[in-house]
Curated annotation (Swiss-Prot):
Gene that this sequence comes from: HOXD4
Protein name: Homeobox protein Hox-D4
Cellular component GO terms, alphabetical: nucleoplasm
Subunit-level organization: Forms a DNA-binding heterodimer with transcription factor PBX1.
SUPFAM superfamilies: Homeodomain-like
Length: 255
């Protein structure tokens, strides 16, 4: 019986890769321990508690294991490596390295300091030059505001002419004592003065010139001539009435 069964079994061709369950049930791997599957001092299912938590259900050994099995085997197949990154570190026997910590978030104060101040100009740009204010751009008659001012035109301050301005005005007065509107505008732009200042200066200069040359004032002369003409016109009718009265008196005496 033994030989016949052996001959029958010898003709039977086993598959090249039989399932692991047949090896376990037949008792071919009875003397293998847990170290054979783990490859180290630690078990095959060892996982770091921090990264890969163990499942709640327990591991159950196969029910058909033959006598002589060293320890309970996992549900995975024969010689199968544990899946996942934890299995690689468990086989080598080294602890799993901790994952790299994320970079710290920047503080709001540091972010504000890193940004450039908008009030400060960039270092590459030059500072803005102040605007140039020419003398003719300035207002000559500037008076402080008086809150107690009731009305009327405020008193204007006296204009101080420079030597250059007086020299140019004297030259112009030497050639023309009276200026046209166009010429007055040209002189005002040239000397950085207003038209009113040019007009007043020429009026005062003409009065001084007449006083130096002892010439009568044209305004006083015209007023005196008008008064004399009015007096002569008022005396003429009275002289005409006197002869008429004398003739009338002689006529009455003759009667």
């Amino acid at each position: 019986m033994v030989m016949s069964s052996y001959m029958v079994n010898s003709k039977y061709v086993d598959p090249k890769f039989p399932p692991c369950e047949e090896y376990l049930q037949g008792g071919y791997l009875g003397e293998q321990g847990a170290e054979y599957y783990g490859g180290g001092t630690q078990g095959a299912d060892f996982q770091p508690p921090g990264l890969y938590p163990r499942p709640d259900f327990g591991e159950q050994p196969f029910g058909g294991g033959g006598p002589g099995t060293g320890s309970a085997l996992p549900t995975r197949g024969h010689g199968q490596e544990p899946s996942g990154p934890g299995g690689h570190y468990a086989a080598s026997g080294e602890p799993c390295p901790a994952p790299p910590a994320p970079p710290p978030a920047p503080l709001p104060g540091a972010r504000a300091c890193s940004q450039s101040d908008p009030k400060q100009p960039p270092p590459g740009t030059a500072l803005k030059q102040p605007a140039v204010v020419y003398p003719w751009m300035k207002k000559v008659h500037v008076n402080s505001v008086n809150p107690n001012y009731t009305g009327g035109e405020p008193k204007r301050s006296r204009t101080a002419y420079t030597r250059q301005q007086v020299l140019e005005l004297e030259k112009e007065f030497h050639f023309n004592r009276y200026l046209t509107r166009r010429r007055r505008i040209e002189i005002a732009h040239t000397l950085c003065l207003s038209e009113r200042q040019i007009k007043i200066w020429f009026q005062n200069r003409r009065m001084k010139w007449k006083k130096d040359h002892k010439l009568p004032n044209t305004k006083g002369r015209s007023s005196s001539s008008s008064s004399s003409s009015s007096c002569s016109s008022s005396t003429a009718p009275s002289q005409h009435l006197q002869p008429m009265a004398k003739d009338h008196h002689t006529d009455l005496t003759t009667l």
